[in-house]
Amino acid sequence: MQQRPLGHTGKDISVIGLGTWQLGADWGDVSEADATAVLASAADAGVTLFDTADVYGDGRSETLIGAFLAQRPDHRITVATKMGRRLPQEPANYSPSNFRAWIDRSRRNLGVATLDLVQLHCPPTAVIDADATYQALDALVADKSIAAYGVSVETCAQALAAIARPNVTNVQIIVNPFRLKPLDEVLPAAQAAGVSIFARVPLASGLLSGKYTATTTFAADDHRTYNRAGEAFDRGETFSGVDFEVGLQAVSRLAAALPPEVSLPAASLAWIASRPGITSGIPGARSVAQARANADAAALLSGGFDLDNFDAVVRQVYDDLLRAAIHTLW
């Protein structure tokens, strides 16, 4: 799989990574055996970026990844974890002492002395803007608790604030055919600064899988049931903030523009990876088949699929169905 530089770290990561929220919680139950099989399938397909967080399954996702990688001592996988959601989202909780506690817990979960990459997990804007935040992170780099750091954000304005900081390695932001604002507002600035962009929620919580209908239901403990209106956390995290029924209309139009041999999720992932300034898209997977299909989408970057035509369709559908409702929100 094609690899791209991770900021200024000297490391390369795959253009399609693996998001592991699904292996922790909030998507229904996934067994340990199934989770391990997903990790193996992704790694065997050339994925060299695993994205996780200390709150995914209260550390379960990190622990599963740590155990898996311990069995592959020669792996080339970069593990990007996140911190900051274990306490109420108040700026005072983003303190050096809490950073240390969270980092040490993740190091134990992953079984490593130095974390590859730690990202603040969608913190309040005041945290992103504070000099003290980056001073504390720089101290963790200096003592080799972490090798690099970045920020996962909700809004384009937050992304730009993080990109302006000299030692930020990456920014995570939602980018997919339902979220186009970052293409013009964030990606050029990231390219100029040498900051990597991870496109998170690349399949809009599965909506871009093309498998859902108006009668589809989800488990009670699945955020696609309990967070559609932002009841538990930012509603942009669920279906990218798009109304489910409107999203289905958009999916229908996007799918109709594809040749029969190209699936909508594969086209979406390839489109994301082809956007200038994107380093990696990080789709999640709950099964070996999903993990393999996501990784295989990278092959569309090598030709045989008209990405320019799909881009034109994406932009038209966005303008017709989505722009008015969501463009100004994030």
Give the role of each language-model region:
Residues 1-76:
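N-terminal binding-site loop/beta-alpha segment at the start of enzyme catalytic domains
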Residues 6, 18, 35, 50, ...:
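Conserved, mostly hydrophobic/aromatic
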Residues 11-16, 46-49, 73-77, 112-116, ...:
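Short, well-ordered coil/turn segments that N-cap beta-strands
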Residues 21-33, 86-100, 125-126:
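Active-site mouth loops of central-metabolism enzymes
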Residues 28-29, 53-62, 87-89, 125-128, ...:
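Acidic-and-aromatic substrate-binding clefts and catalytic sites of carbohydrate-active enzymes
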Residues 29-42, 94-110, 154-161:
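Short, acidic/polar
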Residues 107-126:
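Active-site groove signature of glycoside hydrolases
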Residues 123-317, 329-330:
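Beta/alpha (TIM)-barrel catalytic core signal, keyed to glycine-rich beta->alpha loops juxtaposed to Asp/Glu
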